[in-house]
Amino acid sequence: MKVIFLKDVKGKGKKGETKNVADGYANNFLIKNGYAVEASNAALSTLSAQKKKEDKLAAEELAEAKALKEKMEKLTVELKAKSGEGGRLFGSITSKQIAQTLEKTHGIKVDKRKMDLPEAIRALGHTKVPVKLHHEVTATLDVHVSEE
């Protein structure tokens, strides 16, 4: 029997796949538990429409991320911190502080976990911080730390 998987089934198929499986397995397990539906013409057309919708949504997200990247790479995030001799900070600047300042000053909301800051900034000056906006798009944000 040909079925369309609605959920991932380990060892059998992934969501959205169309596969031939044994009739008993399809009726007694997959269809009964909601893991799959029988592959009729109506179900196949629904699946193709759903895939087109998902592809369109993914393309929109990618375009949005690219536009945000263009905007972010022109910005400089200004932060002030107390520092000692040689430009070393008392404490550090974290991705959370960068995200909050970016939202407050420029109105761009970015999750702090998207910032690829290996360790906190502990010195005055300019630092380039990579920000992962999409799995294909990474922007580089310029962070300037000056003395308070």
Curated annotation (Swiss-Prot):
The keyword Amino-acid biosynthesis does not apply. GO terms for cellular component: ribonucleoprotein complex; ribosome. The keyword Mitochondrion does not apply. GO terms for molecular function: rRNA binding; structural constituent of ribosome. PANTHER family: 50S RIBOSOMAL PROTEIN L9. One of its GO terms (biological process) is translation. Keywords: Ribonucleoprotein, Ribosomal protein, RNA-binding, rRNA-binding. Belongs to the bacterial ribosomal protein bL9 family. This is Large ribosomal subunit protein bL9.
